[in-house]
């Protein structure tokens, strides 16, 4: 029955916990079939109500200091490629690029400023941090962030190793770094790819308790290596919306168990990045060399440029850019 399919499709998109908090939604789940148009209308009405509550909920949590909100460039562009499409050659020198270079750093600046401005209008305060789209960074894009007054950015650990031209070192990974230039300075945090990807792609197939136990054991092994030194920052960064639909119960059991374990273990403390930077300022004498150009996908930009159809799209974009705003 088409009506049953419509209702179930929209019911399934409502989180199990949210369904459990609404008596009528719970009853519809129990009913299971022979839904009415009124049932469908109620489910769609709840969709609108839940969506309307998202921004206020985030705003309230940020005001309590429970979370930190960041922004990204406005339309999710790959900033380094807007600055200069040849930046793709830094990671992949042999990559076939479009014959005409796309170079509009002013567009990258606009995208960044619009993201910051929209965030401020929506949440009442300008964010201190920026997650560049797809963790895509370059020296030129980082300077734009400095000029915009951004305090910190984050990206993948692969960018750190390629910037420093070194192999993986936990003592290097688990501290913020500084980009210090004549035009300003910017803190950079690099995510632990292994720990982040365990949550993003692996633990969804595990029993929640076993997954949390494994994660905590990994944290314990790291903590044992740094007991005598200053506090370290282990950055867990992943797409916030993608993982949970693959977990049982939308990840509620895993997340509740994880936060309970972290809250009860005095060796660990959950912090926002700005909170850590305020308590443990970045060493002013420890500035990174020129930031490597790449993303959190294999440390390069091949996802967005370098294939025939993508190169053609960049040429069309360049033609449109030149025609509309020469």
Range-by-range predicted roles:
Residues 1-92:
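N-terminal catalytic cores of secreted or lumenal carbohydrate-active enzymes
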Residues 1-27, 168-326:
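Active-site and substrate-binding clefts of carbohydrate-active enzymes
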Residues 32-49, 94-108, 126-133, 198-213, ...:
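The substrate-binding groove and active-site-proximal loops of carbohydrate-active enzymes
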Residues 63, 122-123, 139-154, 252-265:
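Short, surface-exposed basic-aromatic patches at helix termini and helix-loop junctions that form
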Residues 69-72, 128, 152-155, 189, ...:
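Hydrophobic faces of well-ordered beta-strands that scaffold small-molecule active sites
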Residues 73-76, 129-138, 274-277:
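Short, solvent-exposed turn/loop segments enriched in Gly/Ser/Thr/Pro and often Arg
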Residues 89-109, 146-181, 187:
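Acidic, His- and aromatic-enriched active-site or binding-groove loops in soluble protein domains
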Residues 94-132, 219-237:
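CE4/NodB-like, metal-dependent polysaccharide N-deacetylase domain
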């Amino acid at each position: 029955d088409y009506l049953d399919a419509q209702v179930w499709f929209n019911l399934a998109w409502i989180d199990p916990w949210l369904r459990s908090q609404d008596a009528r939604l719970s009853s519809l789940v129990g009913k299971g079939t022979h839904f009415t148009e009124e049932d469908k209308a109620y489910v769609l009405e709840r969709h609108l109500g839940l969506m309307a509550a998202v921004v206020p909920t985030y705003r309230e949590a940020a005001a309590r200091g429970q979370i930190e909100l960041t922004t990204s460039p406005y339309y999710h562009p790959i900033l380094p490629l807007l600055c200069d499409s040849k930046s793709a050659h830094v990671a992949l020198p042999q990559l076939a690029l479009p014959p005409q270079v796309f170079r509009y750093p002013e567009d990258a600046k606009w995208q960044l400023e619009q993201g910051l401005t929209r965030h401020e209008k929506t949440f009442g305060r300008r964010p201190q941090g920026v997650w560049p789209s797809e963790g895509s960074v370059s020296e030129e894009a980082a300077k734009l962030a400095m000029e915009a007054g951004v305090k910190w950015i984050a990206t993948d650990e692969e960018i750190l190793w390629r910037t420093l031209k070194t192999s993986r070192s936990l003592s290097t990974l688990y501290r913020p770094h500084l980009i210090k230039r004549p035009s300003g300075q910017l803190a950079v945090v690099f995510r632990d790819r292994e720990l982040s990807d365990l949550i993003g792609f692996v633990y969804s197939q595990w029993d929640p308790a076993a997954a949390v136990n494994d994660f905590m054991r990994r944290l314990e092994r790291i903590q044992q290596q740094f007991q005598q030194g200053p506090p370290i920052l282990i950055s867990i960064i992943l797409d916030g919306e993608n993982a949970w639909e693959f977990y049982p119960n939308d990840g509620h059991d895993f997340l509740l168990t994880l936060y309970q374990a972290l809250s009860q273990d005095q060796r660990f403390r959950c912090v926002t990045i700005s909170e850590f930077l305020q308590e443990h300022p970045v060493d002013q004498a420890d500035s990174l060399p020129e930031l490597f150009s790449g993303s959190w996908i294999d440390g390069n930009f091949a996802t967005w440029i370098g294939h025939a159809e993508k190169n053609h799209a960049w040429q069309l974009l360049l033609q449109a850019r030149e025609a509309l705003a020469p």
